[in-house]
């Protein structure tokens, strides 16, 4: 009878789940206090007026209003603010 030796086992076959990072509310959108605006690793975006920063660097609205993205400062940092309507 024909025989075939067993193949070796592989050490691949793992992958981490996607973390669903990114901008959740874009410029000009209305948000309520507590709404998540951006989920990020590190501070790609910085918190501006009426925006809080969670311990995982998630930016969230502290007040109701419209989202405003702006670039300012000598290092051209990106700030996100909430402008009251």
Swiss-Prot record:
GO MF term set: structural constituent of ribosome
Record region (Disordered): 1-20
SUPFAM superfamilies: Ribosomal L27 protein-like
Entries under InterPro entries matching the protein: Ribosomal_bL27 (IPR001684), Ribosomal_bL27_CS (IPR018261)
One Gene Ontology cellular component annotation held by this UniProt entry: cytosolic large ribosomal subunit
A Gene Ontology BP annotation from the UniProt entry: translation
Stretches assigned to coiled coil: none
Record key words, sorted: Ribonucleoprotein, Ribosomal protein
Stated family: Belongs to the bacterial ribosomal protein bL27 family.
HAMAP family in UniProt: Ribosomal_bL27
Name of the molecule in the record: Large ribosomal subunit protein bL27
Species of provenance: Cronobacter sakazakii (strain ATCC BAA-894)
Underlying gene: rpmA
């Amino acid at each position: 009878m024909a025989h075939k030796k067993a193949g070796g086992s592989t050490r691949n076959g793992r992958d981490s789940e996607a973390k669903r990072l990114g901008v959740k509310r874009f410029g000009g959108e209305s948000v309520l206090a507590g709404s998540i605006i951006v989920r990020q690793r590190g501070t790609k975006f910085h918190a501006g007026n009426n925006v809080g920063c969670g311990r995982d660097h998630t930016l969230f609205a502290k007040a109701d209003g419209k989202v405003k993205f702006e670039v300012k400062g000598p290092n051209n940092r990106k700030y996100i603010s909430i402008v009251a309507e």
